[in-house]
Amino acid sequence: MLKLEQLAELLEKNSAAASARVREFSIGGKRFNFNSQPAVMGVVNLSPDSWYRESVCLSTEAAVRRGKVLAAQGADIVDIGAESTLAHAARVGGPAQTGKLLPVIKELRAARILVSVETYSPKVARAALEAGANVLNLTGTAGSRKMFKMAAAHDAAVIICFVQGKNVREVGNFDLSADSIPMMRDYFSRQIEIAQRAGVEKIILDPGLGFYYRNLQDSAVRVRHQMNIFLNTFRLRELGFPICHALPHAFEFFGEEVRCAEPFFAVLAALGKTDLFRTHEVPRIKAVLETMKVF
């Protein structure tokens, strides 16, 4: 059971990190003041394999409609993916991905909605940027140098995801042997240096809590790990860049109330000072964040 005493101990051990500030910047003409106002990123899934059925759109029209609804509900950015990160999901080739992504990107950008594209493919990244994408949500390290250069050339922001593997579809076991934060800090420091050398100025860091590692299939182990990282987010902010979290569903615990899971995890992520919330439940997360501001 999570207790107040544990939160107090965490803060006492890392008091200096609690006051860390991160870079603020504009994306596509929109200013993000992360230190005073967290942002929300809504999700549109173009893959039929995606687990969160409410976010799945199987046509361009449905995807554009959902993107516009998310923006109207308060999403600052709409994140689009054409290949599920689920371990059993089908692989989707570059041409098939771009065939789905590009029409949606173009229509949402025409509506002045900021668009992020989740990918680990340089070819998909290039096509998405040329179509007007504002953010690359990178779920792999292979080819990252190329994609960083592409992002810099288009003045796009980059979300660097922590991945223990070549990409999100090729991961094994997550190292749970010790405190994960120093390991993530080292990984992000290396990737930040590579990105900055490539000319990327707008960087966001994502611990990758939604990825399917083999040894995190046990629900209690996985959720305990996720909760721990959410609450320790402020320690990663010492790197000087905003932190993004993809909010999980924890169906094993929430069952028929699974749509309440992301709001629950949003509370923990907010306590940890998360800067960007990636969610399938935009209005619920907006309500949580607005309510927490009242205190």
Give short role names for the model-derived ranges:
Residues M1-P48, Q196, E290:
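N-terminal amphipathic alpha-helix/helix-capping segment at the start of soluble metabolic enzymes
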Residues I27, Y52-E61, R65, T85-P103, ...:
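Active-site-adjacent loop and "lid" segments of alpha/beta metabolic enzymes
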Residues A39-V43, D76-D79, L114-S116, N134-V135, ...:
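Structural preference for beta-strand elements that scaffold enzyme active sites
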Residues S47, Y120-S121:
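A generic "binding-loop/recognition-motif" signal
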Residues P48-C57, A75-A82, I203, L209:
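Glycine/serine-rich anion-binding loops at beta->alpha junctions
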Residues R65-G81, A269:
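Catalytic domains of carbohydrate-active enzymes, especially glycoside hydrolases
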Residues L108-I113, R197-V200, E238-L239:
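Short helix-capping segments at alpha-helix termini
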